[in-house]
């Protein structure tokens, strides 16, 4: 039997549980996720074509990305997270907005990979790996969940002085875009490190893109620099 507490940071769960009712407040604590969501949705859809696909969103939180993928045409979307309060918010929002073919479950991705291997066309794990003790285990589980002809998407934060200045000093303390303590620089992941995790899990990195934030328009755009936020689009290597 697997250890249900393995790879779960209880402090992170408690942190997001305290603000679970704020997930759909577009000017609140999760404003940056709402700002970034159109870009990551288009990136995923552009590579994988969500129409008619079975999709898994790992670390779905309150359902911002999961719900938008369902609206984009996915046949079925499953969102998983370890913060039950966030999932309650996601379920309520989907029900109130008549979003069908979507479900949420409080389960570790490692356990789901054992129960439902190779069962999803698209697996997304966005802005999540910097919140867990063992991100490599998350990558392996995502690789085990995707179908042989499917795609896996990751997004996270580079680990360097620039990302510390942008996402902790500026975003948390100066501009107050996100609550203090949202990020832990020690958990940030360099692209080379994530690429190594992908290779070891049997995934080929098909595309890498950085994301840059335009303060005046409060929108994100793709860029070539992976100095701060970045995304990977991956395919099974076998």
UniProtKB/Swiss-Prot annotation:
Catalytic activity: a 3-demethylubiquinol + S-adenosyl-L-methionine = a ubiquinol + S-adenosyl-L-homocysteine + H(+); a 3-(all-trans-polyprenyl)benzene-1,2-diol + S-adenosyl-L-methionine = a 2-methoxy-6-(all-trans-polyprenyl)phenol + S-adenosyl-L-homocysteine + H(+)
CDD domains: AdoMet_MTases (cd02440)
Ligand binding (S-adenosyl-L-methionine): 40, 59, 81, 126
Pathway(s): Cofactor biosynthesis; ubiquinone biosynthesis
Methyltransferase recorded as keyword: yes
GO molecular function, one term: 3-demethylubiquinol 3-O-methyltransferase activity
Keywords: Methyltransferase, S-adenosyl-L-methionine, Transferase, Ubiquinone biosynthesis
InterPro entries reported in the protein's UniProt record: SAM-dependent_MTases_sf, UbiG_MeTrfase
Enzyme class at the top of the EC tree: transferase
GO BP term, example: methylation
This enzyme's EC code(s): 2.1.1.222, 2.1.1.64
HAMAP family: UbiG
Family to which the UniProt record says this protein belongs: Belongs to the methyltransferase superfamily. UbiG/COQ3 family.
PANTHER family tied to this protein: METHYLTRANSFERASE, UBIQUINONE BIOSYNTHESIS O-METHYLTRANSFERASE, MITOCHONDRIAL
Protein name per Swiss-Prot or TrEMBL: Ubiquinone biosynthesis O-methyltransferase
Organism: Neisseria meningitidis serogroup C (strain 053442)
């Amino acid at each position: 039997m697997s250890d249900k507490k393995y790879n779960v940071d209880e402090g992170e769960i408690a942190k997001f549980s305290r603000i679970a009712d704020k997930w759909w407040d577009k000017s609140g604590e999760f404003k940056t996720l709402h700002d970034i969501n159109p870009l990551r949705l288009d990136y995923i859809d552009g590579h994988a074509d969500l129409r008619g696909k079975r999709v898994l969103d790992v670390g779905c939180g309150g359902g911002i990305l999961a719900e938008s993928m369902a609206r984009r045409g996915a046949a079925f979307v499953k969102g998983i997270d370890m913060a039950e309060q966030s999932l309650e918010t996601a379920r309520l929002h989907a029900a109130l907005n008549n979003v069908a073919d979507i479900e949420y479950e409080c389960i570790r991705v490692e356990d789901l990979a054992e129960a439902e291997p190779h069962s999803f066309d698209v697996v997304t794990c966005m802005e999540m790996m910097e919140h867990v003790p063992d991100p490599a285990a998350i990558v392996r589980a995502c690789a085990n969940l995707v179908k042989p002809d499917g795609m896996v998407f990751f997004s996270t934060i580079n680990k360097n002085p620039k990302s510390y200045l942008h996402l902790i000093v500026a975003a948390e303390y100066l501009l107050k875009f996100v609550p203090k303590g949202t990020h832990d620089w020690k958990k940030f992941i360099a692209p080379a490190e994530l690429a190594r995790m992908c290779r070891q899990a049997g995934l080929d990195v098909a595309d890498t893109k950085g994301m840059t934030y335009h303060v005046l328009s409060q929108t994100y755009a793709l860029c070539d620099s992976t100095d701060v936020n970045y995304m990977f689009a991956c395919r099974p290597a076998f």
